[in-house]
């Protein structure tokens, strides 16, 4: 072969290789996978970093009540086992047969999952930082209410009986008072079935009719059988070289991508390279459907059972209340989502169903229930009477029934919006299996 022909074919092979790499290589900045990780989305994606002082003419904050989801955590024991076994086997197949560029293959080659079972669901350093920084920003917004000196007549903290909620509360306290001052904080004894922080744990009827009801997952099953998901499954079987790749396997890969993305903003999980901006939306929508029907508006009982938390909110926000000025609860996704629905937030005009994919919808856990998601209500004393500021993810939100042209809602109007739901709250009756 002549030198010119050799150079020509060499150039062609280099060009083809570059084109192939451009097509296959995962680009984290371009795909923005981290915005579509449902309840495993890191809080940094949704956080409001503008922490300027919140002021309203002639008004000053007097009381606050908040619900905080724990920060970024480890997977469950079952997930840890499957990641260490199933995904390790699949990683080896991908290295042998997968259609990935060299850079992505190298990420699989160096991937090493080291978690032990006894670390299941533990809060991780990123989760601690989420709560510390969140507390600092809230304190900056309301310095005249969230004082940096702890007093148990002013502050009330409570968490569920889990390591991740306890550590989240301690991290939040660190952000408010400093690392050397948190030992003086008093916490009430944590309860496994806390009637406010985890009300659904004490609702047998919800467990039977919703949580354990196969019909509640019908829309998820229908979407998993749709052309959208089946094409994704087909593409991933081809890309990975795993011929018998199942829907559960794909979900495990998506979940692992989510956890590893949430843990460290500087590291790209190899499992994220299986997805594109479009295909990850398919995985996200499966989660949207599940959390809509299990924890959202799918069944009335799901959010009606949150009424004890609603009653507690008004007991603490009441401008004449003698309870501590600031009440902070540290809990879980299941509580936050149900309470969002109880408040009437993010309700779409039509129920979310499998055919809703591709359209706009408000119920998106990636945005409303990321790790460390939060709801905060602040009572203000104003010349015209008490008013309430409602905030979700550190931004003002309009509660249905309140005016949408101002962040502040008259306390009387705010209370009236929930009066029927709170006054008729008979938790034991609604949760009894008849």
Where are these regions (language model features)?
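A positional/structural detector of protein chain ends, strongest at the extreme C-terminus
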Residues: 1-3, 433-434
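Cleavable N-terminal signal peptides of Sec/SRP-targeted secreted and luminal proteins
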Residues: 3-21
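Signature for phosphate-centric chemistry
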Residues: 21-156, 160-434
